[in-house]
UniProtKB/Swiss-Prot annotation:
Gene: hisA
GO biological process, any: L-histidine biosynthetic process
Listed pathway(s): Amino-acid biosynthesis; L-histidine biosynthesis; L-histidine from 5-phospho-alpha-D-ribose 1-diphosphate: step 4/9
Family: Belongs to the HisA/HisF family.
Residues the record marks as active site: 9, 131
Enzymatic reactions: 1-(5-phospho-beta-D-ribosyl)-5-[(5-phospho-beta-D-ribosylamino)methylideneamino]imidazole-4-carboxamide = 5-[(5-phospho-1-deoxy-D-ribulos-1-ylimino)methylamino]-1-(5-phospho-beta-D-ribosyl)imidazole-4-carboxamide
Gene source species: Bacteroides fragilis (strain YCH46)
Annotated protein name in UniProt: 1-(5-phosphoribosyl)-5-[(5-phosphoribosylamino)methylideneamino] imidazole-4-carboxamide isomerase
Cell compartment(s), UniProt: Cytoplasm
Length: 239
């Protein structure tokens, strides 16, 4: 069964969502992310994706207190991303309750450091973030398109021990227009043992069903839930 991973994106300690990574499109859904996380847990959710959008913009962890509150008041398994650029950032994330961390920009900008993290913490705790725009990896909160092509990037890091990848098609993220199903099928055809976490574009329970039928191991979703396109009750079929 596909693993369900709701997302809580944080700006100024509040639960927000963006469209295509545009900070100008910010919409606040809840002033208290802890209450959101507790509601998820009460409905059978076991895993949570927390993104520090302030951290992504400022290149260091910012909303670690919110992470700590969610971790201390729920039993959710949390993966945390956004602005992780140093050993200190990772220590802050893990000390404040993250069980896993996601590195995207750092894997492009400083691959030696990212590989040290894989070696030090293990592939169970380090997730590769592959944020894609026109099949190139985007960095710095999706504001900059790098020269890294998606498939060589994935091949390189799977050879270096990465087992889990969050792949976000930026053109789909927050648009409620459906996920990049063909892209995910292509990735799994090339990397059949990869724990691929699809992210971006999920607009309905049918999208989750389609990803499940395509063999995608896990899915991250946010706006569809916050906008009422998907209900927590509907998700029970996958739990």
């Amino acid at each position: 069964m596909i693993e369900l991973i709701p997302a809580i994106d944080i700006i100024d300690g509040k639960c927000v969502r963006l469209s295509q990574g545009d900070y100008g499109s910010k919409k606040v859904y809840n002033e208290n992310p802890v209450e959101v996380a507790k509601e998820f847990e009460a409905n059978g959710i076991r895993r949570l994706h927390v993104v520090d959008l302030d951290g992504a913009a400022s290149h260091h962890v910012v909303n670690y207190r919110t992470l700590d509150l969610i971790a201390s008041r729920t039993s959710l398994i949390i993966d945390f991303g956004g602005g992780l650029k140093s050993d200190e950032d990772l220590i802050i994330a893990f000390e404040n309750g993250a069980q896993m961390v996601t590195g995207g920009s750092i894997a492009v900008r400083n691959p030696d450091l990212f590989c040290r993290w894989i070696d030090r913490y293990g592939s169970g705790k380090i997730i590769l973030g592959a944020d894609v725009k026109d099949r190139r990896i985007a960095v710095n909160g999706w504001k900059v398109e790098s020269t890294c092509e998606l498939f060589p990037f994935l091949k390189d890091y799977t050879q270096k021990g990465i087992e889990k990848v969050i792949c976000t098609d930026i053109s789909c993220d927050g648009m409620l227009a459906g996920p990049s199903l063909d892209l995910y099928k292509e990735i799994l055809a090339e990397h059949p043992t990869l724990y691929l976490i699809a992210s971006g574009g999920v607009s309905s329970i049918a999208d989750i069903e389609a990803l499940h039928e395509a063999g995608v191991p896990a899915v991250i979703f946010g706006k569809a839930l916050y906008e009422g396109r998907i209900t927590l009750k509907e998700l029970q079929a996958f739990l």
